Amino acid sequence: MSEIKTDDPKRGIKLRGADKTARIPIKVVPLQEKLKKPEWIRAKLPSRKFFEIKDILREQKMHTVCEEASCPNIGECFSKGTATFMIMGDICTRRCPFCDVGHGRPNMLDPDEPRNLAESVKAMNLRYVVITSVDRDDLRDGGAQHFADCIKAIRETSPNTKIEILVPDFRGRLDIALKILAETPPDVMNHNLETHPSLYRKARPGANYQHSLDLLKRYKEMMPHIPTKSGIMVGLGETDEDVREIMRDMRAHNIEMITIGQYLQPSDGHLPVLRYVTPEQFKIFEKEAYELGFSNAAIGAMVRSSYHADEQAAEALRECEF
């Protein structure tokens, strides 16, 4: 299990919205008038299956990024019987002002979480599961061993289930984290770049664009048969050419799968939406992604990193079998 530092009385206190972003380097400045949400930004209403999935998650004491990050696709994904599990708690050590996950000093790791996760996957009869996490800068391996423990637990109870992990950047702990995840590999390795490097100080304080690229390139070199994946949001202030530059950088670092979706502001305390990319422009990005050599490109306004991840990964996983 990942090692943790000594207990702290401030553990477990979660800050959200303006409280969370109060101390970031570049302050969130709201627009005088918000951009009107276009008609193509629409989420599907939940079905009865949605509530059944929520019951299973609560019973197993599991968190999903779908809920914690206020994902607009939660109704559709839960209704299909799919979910992206968020491990290591619901409190992040980073303060990214685009994200709705709470910030603070996280609680100690739950040693039962890998077993609870495996039981949830089995109860939901999932053929494909995505596991992500908050950033855990308080852990000596960034939480890599906990990811590995979760992978092992799922393999034992659901051997036919494919596993994608969406990992943090393991800042300062990359060598040990990659070693652990090479010894217990997923079926797909995902880490998001999120946005253009010129916007990192504003959108991803504490992160580094080149470090994130190197994470995926190094893992691919260690595990050439494991597909690698990354994603970005649009609407934070980037240009179309910035998006193309990111795609070229991804391919130069052997990233095979890409997601691009529209950023939606979770609250007034988060970064504002600076543009809504049209469906036509998303189609252009998709065409350009395939021309650059991505094996799969999920690109559209409502696309998120794990949205329809099972369908996106199917072709890449088939290719790896041959």
From Swiss-Prot:
Q: Name one Pfam family in it.
A: Radical_SAM
Q: Name one GO molecular function term.
A: metal ion binding
Membrane-spanning ranges = none
Mention any one GO cellular component term assigned to this protein in its UniProt record.
cytoplasm
Residues annotated to bind [4Fe-4S] cluster 2: C92, C96, C99
Q: In its keyword annotation, does this UniProt entry include Translocase? A: no
**Enzyme Commission code:** 2.8.1.8
Q: Which family does it belong to?
A: Belongs to the radical SAM superfamily. Lipoyl synthase family.
HAMAP family, per this entry? Lipoyl_synth
What name is this protein filed under?
Lipoyl synthase
- Supply the source organism for this entry: Neisseria meningitidis serogroup C (strain 053442)
